[in-house]
Amino acid sequence: MNPNQKILCTSATAIVIGTIAVLIGVANLGLNIGLHLKPNCNCSHSQPEATNTSQTIINNYYNETNITQISNTNIQMEERASRDFNNLTKGLCTINSWHIYGKDNAVRIGENSDVLVTREPYVSCDPDECRFYALSQGTTIRGKHSNGTIHDRSQYRALISWPLSSPPTVYNSRVECIGWSSTSCHDGKSRMSICISGPNNNASAVVWYNRRPVAEINTWARNILRTQESECVCHNGVCPVVFTDGSATGPADTRVYYFKEGKILKWESLTGTAKHIEECSCYGERTGITCTCRDNWQGSNRPVIQIDPVAMTHTSQYICSPVLTDNPRPNDPNVGKCNDPYPGNNNNGVKGFSYLDGVNTWLGRTISTVSRSGYEMLKVPNALTDDRSKPIQGQTIVLNTDWSGYSGSFMDYWAEGDCYRACFYVELIRGRPKEDKVWWTSNSIVSMCSSTEFLGQWNWPDGAKIEYFL
């Protein structure tokens, strides 16, 4: 074959191969266009629609990452749909001491980061995780709007949650509902959150379930409708919640509402011998729910509401022990009161908690009798029923030289084991009114859980230096 023939042969071969490549490309383009222009295709949406799985797969058949995410979402939704209501079948674990569980250092970190102003914090768990909760003030500590956040009620407050032991920031916080008083709990299938908002004489509560509003409750006494400021507890889908509407320094109207999937099953007016109820801290075990509350009117001893979520009934009394746990309070007397308030709190108080379990009973309280400083846990056997019971063991959580605040109970009802591990948190308030060189009022959180071991103790203060904010 002469050179000219070789050139012609090579050229012809190249032309044939090129033509085939062009035809393949055209066919591929046509196939893509055909798939994307199928009937019922919503071609104006480039992002996957989670509510339409088949459409999402069509729009993103070429993107393995999106398909994986859709599959994971579907699996999670199926898992949640197959979950059962939580039942309170276990008792409390033996409590010999308390170990550190979580600490967010929110005020320290907020000195140079976008940390939100909060108060009234708590902890609540679900089958997947435990999270910190609090009422945000709609501003950061360093923001100019933090001026005036000493006030409890405003249009800018919201119940937020964020990962355990992280500070609440504008980037990691999830808004649960809007309001200045709250409670929240998980029934095993989904979470119920309740927020109260509105003016003092016309407040109302909105009940959210599975991140949707389900029910509303209007004020009945037109005097600051309010609720627990810590987690509620559910048994077989029934979630009791304690509300109060009325005077903080006189008789008030307290009710126990029973919810299921956010819907109101019934409500009862307060029964028993408790005279005033606010800000209850609740826990559940052996099908019962126990709430330790605040008598802001008269009692330095704490009222207790015991709830039967099966019968949807309750009763109330005071902790009998002479170990007084409200603040302010007088010195501990020799004999306590089971059915009447022990005087000396001067129309004031602070949210608190206890674990009332016979000889396994522990009470929490500020160390100071006159201010919200220090915090200690005291083992007081049979404190609920014995009016002469005294501490036999204790553990300091926060030294009296450091500020404390509200405290409350919580438990991880989904943790493995044959008993429920008791846990609590302490609010570490900083800023006004005690530290009035700054314009804001906020807090950090420390939380502890029970141990069967006899562990050592340590001081767990907020740790922020106010002078760094000046």
PLM regions and their residue ranges:
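Residue-level detector of Asp-centered blade-edge/turn motifs that repeat once per structural unit
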Residues: 125-128, 187-188, 235, 285, ...
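Short glycine/acidic-enriched loop and turn motifs that connect beta-strands
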Residues: 138-143, 199, 247-250, 297-299, ...
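Hydrophobic, helix-forming membrane-interacting segments
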Residues: 6-42
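Entry beta-strands of beta-propeller and related beta-repeat scaffolds
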Residues: 129-134, 190-192, 203-205, 238-241, ...
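Surface loop/turn signatures of beta-propeller and other carbohydrate-active proteins
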Residues: 89-124, 169-189, 193-196, 211-231, ...
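Long, low-complexity intrinsically disordered regions enriched in small/polar
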Residues: 42-79, 83, 87
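Beta-propeller blade signature
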Residues: 156-163, 255-258, 304-308, 377-379, ...
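Blade-level signature of beta-propeller repeat domains, shared across WD40, Kelch, NHL, RCC1
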Residues: 409-416, 420-470
